């Protein structure tokens, strides 16, 4: 890995509003931990983004310095893709805003949100969208992988309810992707994982659900003859 000079770090820090962590910092080891505790990778630095502009600056810095880049949303990926050794870890976990538009039944969600964060904000208005089954899963990773859960049989997969996305591409451009704008990119995001850029905002369609939901297991008698 290329050694970063103090001047390079100071230049980046001048344009970055979030927090920058190095291995010697107190918060470093806590922030690099993810859901799968078996992952023990150590980035050269961690940048904790607080806005889309922070993400743009982080991607551009990583490109300029030829750093391996990993992106953390909810940090729930079992393979530990959120963390890299000796590179730049871009941490989005502080970007957790959810905004619900009751008139259009749409929600905009930042990439640090978990399913629990999204559900809590939407259910305050009796609304929901198909997500996963574990409240600690990240919205970003679930959505970019396709996403299915308890509501999928009625309302489809998570990506069927994704209306648009704000994306920072690998070359540092900020694009809006939807069915009518950058449609090829939008098609790729809907199930293509994190291969096409860093999504900094998702827009979802919401549906009336609850507040009371009856759930349970249905057990069918076996149709096979006994032994």
Regions inferred by a protein language model and the residue ranges of each:
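C-terminal cap/substrate-recognition region of VAO/PCMH-type FAD-linked oxidoreductases
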Residues: 22, 128, 165-166, 170-227
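N-terminal accessory segments
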Residues: 1-148, 153-154, 161, 196, ...
